[in-house]
Amino acid sequence: MSVQTNLVIKLEEIHKTYHTGEVDVHAVRGVSLEILPGEFVAIMGSSGSGKSTLMNMIGALDRPTSGHYWLDGIDVSTLDRDALADIRNEKIGFVFQGFNLLARTSALENVEMPLLYNHKRIPSHEQHERATHSLELVGLGQRTDHHPNQLSGGQQQRVAIGRALVNRPSLLLADEPTGNLDSQTSIEIMGVFQKLNEQNITIIMVTHELDVARYTKRMVVLRDGKIITDEAVQNRSFAEKELQQLRQAQQAVKLAP
């Protein structure tokens, strides 16, 4: 079975069924989806919609019960656990709600961590260069030696994003990445994602918040394991503009008598 080679993601009639006792739970029901390089897609849905199950399959953390999933032209639907682990490390960068940083390790060393498990055995000097570049991409080029307890929540999430980028993945997969952040810091982090996407980095973001999804370019909504909406984002939000307006408002308050 062939697939378009220019697609980052192609899902074809994906089903996922969990067997719990005498009851079969159909978490994902016949989902088909195509994502091109450089897209910025939000996957939305309420609890029980199937979005988390779909994310796990896109992230090669789980396999579909039936259907096919191609990542960068590779059919990963039937790969064994070891092969899936290689695919995850090489082609997918993960950003989670929790930062999951090593407390006694610098920002640079945290970002270098995925390179230690890269089967290509990247030389140490290149690991250092890649990690430094990743931190520069997320605006932390001057914080490479800082430990997590020396960084704000937003800065820690930037380190986590840098870590996700260091293997130069085909796909950045973010699961509720602003869930632990205050509103202003959330806007700043969405600004980081928007700037990365401007550099043609493909991003899929799983969220239940419409305000977060509006920073993306395309919104896919699930209900009862099926896609019910797949359309371009209307009235898209732009983090840089919102931050500028917020700073102006804060300055006006300071200047008020």
For the regions a protein language model found, what residue spans apply to each?
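Pre-NBD coupling/linker segments of ABC/ABC-like ATPases
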Residues: S2-V3
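ABC family nucleotide-binding domain
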Residues: L7-L222
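Conserved beta-strand-loop-alpha-helix hinge in the C-terminal portion
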Residues: K226-Q251
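Non-catalytic connector elements of ABC transporters
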Residues: L255-P257
